Amino acid sequence: MRLSEILTVALVTGATAYNLPNNLKQIYDKHKGKCSKVLAKGFTNGDASQGKSFSYCGDIPGAIFISSSKGYTNMDIDCDGANNSAGKCANDPSGQGETAFKSDVKKFGISDLDANIHPYVVFGNEDHSPKFKPQSHGMQPLSVMAVVCNGQLHYGIWGDTNGGVSTGEASISLADLCFPNEHLDGNHGHDPNDVLFIGFTSKDAVPGATAKWKAKNAKEFEDSIKSIGDKLVAGLKA
């Protein structure tokens, strides 16, 4: 399904999000299923039947995204961090009590990210081979990320890393923003490989104290990082 068709579906279902700018529409269609500048390869999307065909790609100047011959990647659910068994995370079989950047986020007056409130992306892979460390390519923890999902644009932050070799994972709050009608929870994610996660290598991607870390819901937090996200996305070239 091309992005124009996905956009039509999104409008019919009444899903709400930020407008997808033309340059990002072009990027989505141009890079789908392709990567010439592979930064690291041999990863999965959490589904062993689809093989280790997922990679981190540097084809977009100033950005890193997850690519595969199947398109992009899926969106599994992450519930790590504060309140990791609350709400729709109650049935998460693999939730952990802290995120990779717990010590970094404490400076903003919260104990850790809350998957039910903070729309974060799991990006980068540690502990197992292959590994990928986004910091080695300029990304910084808790930086703004752009997510194209369900034909729409959303913003989140880089909030956790994966200890294994899988990709395509985001907090339950981000998943609900992207796919409000799919009834996702800690044990049920979005399976199609049509989600584009974009991390930025610019220092300008770090919101710091300007983000509403003490937000009451995901939309409030997302709105607080929108101005940064808009500037970063506007600078992307297909």
From Swiss-Prot:
Chief place of localization: secreted
GO cellular component: extracellular region
InterPro entries: Chitosanase_fungal (IPR009939)
Domain of life of the source: Eukaryota
Induction notes from the record: Expressed during human infection.
Swiss-Prot/TrEMBL GO biological process terms: polysaccharide catabolic process
Single annotated GO MF: chitosanase activity
Keyword annotations from UniProtKB, A to Z: Allergen, Carbohydrate metabolism, Glycoprotein, Glycosidase, Hydrolase, Polysaccharide degradation, Secreted, Signal
Function according to Swiss-Prot or TrEMBL: Chitosanase catalyzing the endo-type cleavage of chitosan, the deacylated form of chitin. Chitosanase may be crucial in the degradation of the deacetylated portion of chitin in the fungal cell wall. Chitoolisaccharides produced by the hydrolysis of partially N-acetylated chitosan are known to have many biological activities, including antibacterial activity, immune-enhancing effects, and elicitor activity. The chitosans with higher degrees of deacetylation were shown to be the better substrates.
Descriptive protein name: Endo-chitosanase
Species this chain originates from: Aspergillus fumigatus (Neosartorya fumigata)
Taxonomic classification: Eukaryota, Fungi, Dikarya, Ascomycota, Pezizomycotina
Gene giving rise to this polypeptide: csn
